[in-house]
Amino acid sequence: MAVNFDGNIYTCDEGRMLANMGDEIFRLGSVDNTYRELMLSPAAHAVCTASCVEALPICCECVYSPYCSVCPMVTYGLEGDLLHRDEREYKCVIAKGILTHIFSVIHRNNQEEMEILRRWANV
C-alpha cells in the first residue's frame, strides 16, 4: 500500500502515481477509513482477483503458474485492463525464460551450477 500526501491510500506506489495523472482505479480509500474498509474496497477486491494466477485463463494452464505472479498495475498499464490476457507480455516472457533456465540447471544437476543456484537462493 502507498499513502499519498493528501491522505489517499492506494494498492501500490505505482497506483498512487497513476492517480496523480488522474486515474484513481487503484485507490483503496483514505487515512480516514478503517483497515477493514480499505481491504473490503472495490479496488482491493479487483486487485486481489486480478493477482490470482490460478483464476486467469491465460495462466491457469501454464506450467509455471505455481512459481509466477502477475502485477495488475503493469497489466493495466500495458493492456488497459486489470486481467492479464497476453502471454507475450514482457513480464510473462521474462519469467518463463528465467524459470526455464533455473529448471534446466536443476535438471542437468551439475554440482558447480547447483552450488551457484543454492547460494543465489540462499539455501
Language-model segments: which ranges?
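Radical SAM enzyme core and accessory elements
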Residues: 20, 30, 54-123
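C-terminal accessory region of radical SAM enzymes
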Residues: 15-63
